[in-house]
A protein has these predicted regions:
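N-terminal beta1-alpha1 ligand-phosphate binding loop
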Residues: 2-28
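C-terminal folded domains that constitute the principal catalytic or ligand-binding module
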Residues: 103-104, 112-183
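Short, charged, surface-exposed secondary-structure boundary motifs
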Residues: 18-19, 50, 72-73, 137-143
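Short, acidic/turn-prone active-site loops that include or flank metal/cofactor-
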Residues: 13, 44, 67-69, 132-137
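Electropositive phosphate-/nucleotide-binding environments in soluble metabolic enzymes
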Residues: 15, 19, 84-88, 147, ...
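Residues at the starts of beta-strands that form the adenosine-phosphate
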Residues: 3-5, 36, 59, 128
Length: 183
């Protein structure tokens, strides 16, 4: 039974890059019975209907950093615990146990592209937002001029898997990431 669904909403330019770590996520988790990963190419003018439907039913969350000016429901996930960042905006924390949100979107793009994707996708702005607080800085070395404190897509997924108890899946991804990052 699928316990977690990850949608890698990927910018078209990212699909062509040899340094894209979203493909590693798909490769590492493709055999998992608990986790499903789908790559969806982001379209500015035509949102994916499944994501729209899940968003409208409030069953879709967005893994994206906190923004100081947000008024939406936002959680910080640290050491396996959800912490409300805007308690007035929601009623229940999305835990693996209560199953309230098992569908999560990750923006697979550069930070500049991801910010643009979020701005131009109203349905994503209305999603519950999950911010991860990693214990360590990024180890990703294949791109220059990275935003301080930012993680690549594979690192975000590893952190999410760690924090939500999918340790074996996280370790499989970590092995692939370590090899990929040595190039």
């Amino acid at each position: 039974m699928t316990e977690l669904v990850l949608y890698l909403l990927t910018h078209s330019r990212e699909l062509q890059k040899s340094t894209n770590t979203g493909a590693l996520v798909v490769q590492a988790l493709s055999a998992s019975l608990k986790i499903k990963v789908e790559v969806i190419e982001w379209q500015r003018k035509a949102a994916d209907q499944r994501l729209l439907d899940l968003s409208e039913r409030q069953q879709l969350g967005l893994v994206y950093p906190l923004q100081a000016d947000t008024a939406q429901a936002c959680y910080l996930l640290q050491q396996g615990q959800y912490q409300a960042q805007n308690p007035a905006a929601f009623t229940e924390l999305p835990t693996r146990q209560n199953g309230s949100i098992k569908h999560w979107v990750l923006l697979d793009a550069t930070w500049q592209e991801a910010a643009k994707m979020l701005r131009q996708s109203p349905y994503l702005q209305s999603c519950y937002r999950l911010a991860l607080k990693p214990d360590a800085p990024s180890l990703y070395k294949l791109r220059r001029n990275q935003k301080a404190g930012a993680l690549c897509t594979a690192e975000v997924v590893m952190e999410l898997l760690q924090q939500t108890g999918f340790i074996n899946e996280k370790e499989q991804l970590m092995l692939l990431f370590d090899e990929f990052n040595k190039r």
